[in-house]
Amino acid sequence: MFSNSYLVYISETNLIHMTNEILAKSPSQGGILLTDHTKMVLNLGYSLAKNYPSYNDETLKELMVALILHDIGKCSKHYQDYMKKDVELDSEDLESPIKFNGPYHNSISWAFAIVCLNGVRPSIFKPYKHFPLLSSVLYHHTVKDDETLRAGDIITSIGEGDITVMKEFYMEMCKYVKDIFGIDILSSHDYTLVDEPSEIGYPLSDEKLFIDKKNCKTPGEYFNFTAISFIDRSILNYADRVVSSREYDNERILVNDVDYISSIHNDRLTRIPFKEDFSKYTDKKRLDIQIDTINKCFDNKEINTNVICASAGFGKTLMGLITYMKYQKKTLWVLPTLSLCESTYKSVIDELETLNASDQVSVGLFYSNEFKKGDVNSDIIIIGIDALLGRLSKNNLTPLLLDALNANVIFDEFHEFLMNEPLFAGFINLLKTRKDYTLANTFLLSATPLDFKNLWGNSHIKYWEDMPIYGGDIEVEIHYKEETTLDDMSFSFPENSITILPTVDAAQYAYINTPIETKLIHARYLPEDKKNHLDTVFNIYGKKSTVKYKTPIIGTNIIGTGFNISTRTINDYIITPMRTIQTIGRGSRFGEYSRVIYNVISSNMKADTGIRKLIESCACMSMRTQWVELLKDYDGKVITKNELYTIYNDFMKKYTKEWNMYISDCFKNSTDNLTKIRYVSGNYKKSDDDKLNRGYTYRGESTNFYATVPLDDGTYMDPIVCDINIRFKDDTDPKDRYYFMLSGLFNFPSKNELKYRWKIKKNYEATFDNCLGLARSKDCPLLLSNFNYKKDIGLYRRDL
């Protein structure tokens, strides 16, 4: 489209004319000019930025530069040549890749900022001075270029003429920003253009998605850069997608119709109040406390983050709905696991029915990168924490990214977010951003809440710690037992009991070897079977259960926290301070029993690595040991729930120093691991929807794969997601892994046998990694010949 040699000498007048012919989208996608597209993104972005009190003159100016630069790479000749072909992209996927020779436009835009602006390049003295700008520009799409490409190489590869056009485009947009918004970008030396681009050896791989805390001078600097980058990226991505989607009146956006633009994002958040009906709630005293607490939260305008320390059974679901009613604002309801998402969705639907409000409030359910119920416009969206944090690092469903920072958010059972993996740091950074940099309201619900004072103090946050213990007079009869192996299990499985075991294998072993009828629940089922088992648990032990004989339930920690179920007897193999309080909440949760039996089983962790790994992932080991010893002293005694909570609170006060140190260590490890998350993907295909993540995720290194097993009827099980540790221990001999892969060749369909044979090499580790990579696709499952599958047991070892 452009002659590079000619453009170097083209007159300024003609150059401006050329910038007005540059396309942002092909004709089939609307044929919008890049100048118009960028102006609309600027208009939307500026309107959004006014909702954040954290923006000052400098940070707002940097945001405007990012909005100008995000698509400037489309000025390149190879991109415009592609536009001329008018190749229609997948209309359902705005992330469809541009297939052409040369760097992708987001990489070019990023490189232009580093090479062609005077003060944006990162330095060893100020590595994150302009991190929000560079990160937002690069990651407004996934990075598809070779990560070894350097900024200088990218600019050199596209030609001097292209750079000239980009510079003119940049100057034109800077003038627009000054004329319309009164922001003089060029008054800051950092954002002025260099005379001649220099060779800069700064590679794409150095532009992390998340900041490395070690390069920040203070925790405050780390949180500030992280928060601004979150907000900048959300504004840029959302504004870009709104304009590109053509769902709104782009002509009104282009002329900067302020009222119309404001309505686009404000209407997403504002909700019409519904008429509640509390007549079916018989516990008026508890209801009054719930309503009064939320009213006090609403009236205190200086606090936007409230931690509700309510015991199990106190009605946190109803409190969440009262919050929605009071604030009349779109709400994200965030849970730690997929099972809890399903459970909470059911609880919210049930509560809305009790309130006679089912037809007034829409409820969505989102996890595994898709809506299972409702859609992005639902009034309340139940969402997993992984899926919510994924919006900070992925570019699909950008309205949810904006909601993550602007909607009301309820973090339910948030104590479960504490871990050494990136999820905890992601949660803390998001919470800190919402607390100090936005006007949005956040509610955190837990019977065993984390105390954040050690991380950032008490500003803008209130702990509601005087909530009465629900069912505090209910008696708890404690029994203590030590066991070395699963064969030592001495507690029976009486009617109306749940048994919580540390691993799936342990739960399956107990189920198989128990002579009486029991029900089993864990995570290793096919989706439909898992749903049926969860429904069974709720039908037997749920709030609306009419079942007289309650079949014993055997399961994993999937049922120990958050489930709205009630039982009379609990056999607990997972002993930590927090989990004891959480688990005892399943005992007489609905107040139907005056006494519950709590059987504490302390397993030999040296003999059972599964238990040790689980405990280490969620508790301070020294505190866990002391807690077990404390419970041992109550063997055979009867205390009330009130007394148990007092014991727990006194214990946590005694070990405050150790607990704060543990939280700090978790945060440090988590922030270190957060920098490992990078979304560098290849070309998107619809067939990729079921592919499992590679590399590092918010839960750590991804070792999941699809597996299948031969069934007794001669068929094969539908592919199921497994962790590689189901088959291998950490010290497994590489040769064993190799032969496993050979024996696991599975013609499903036939083309995949060729894939595996092509990948198999003499290098055992390479073979393992290659086959595991293939097995991340649902149509290439690995065969687990030593496993079987049954609907009641799930995927289990044949030698169990």
Give residue ranges: language-model regions.
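Walker A/P-loop
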Residues: K301-T323
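SF2 helicase catalytic motif II
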Residues: A387-L388, L397-K432
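Inter-Walker segment of RecA-like/P-loop motor cores
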Residues: T354-S393
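N-terminal accessory nucleic-acid engagement/regulatory domains that precede
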Residues: F2-E12, S123-I272, K778
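Conserved strand-helix element at the start of the C-terminal RecA-like helicase core
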Residues: K330-C341, F493-T514
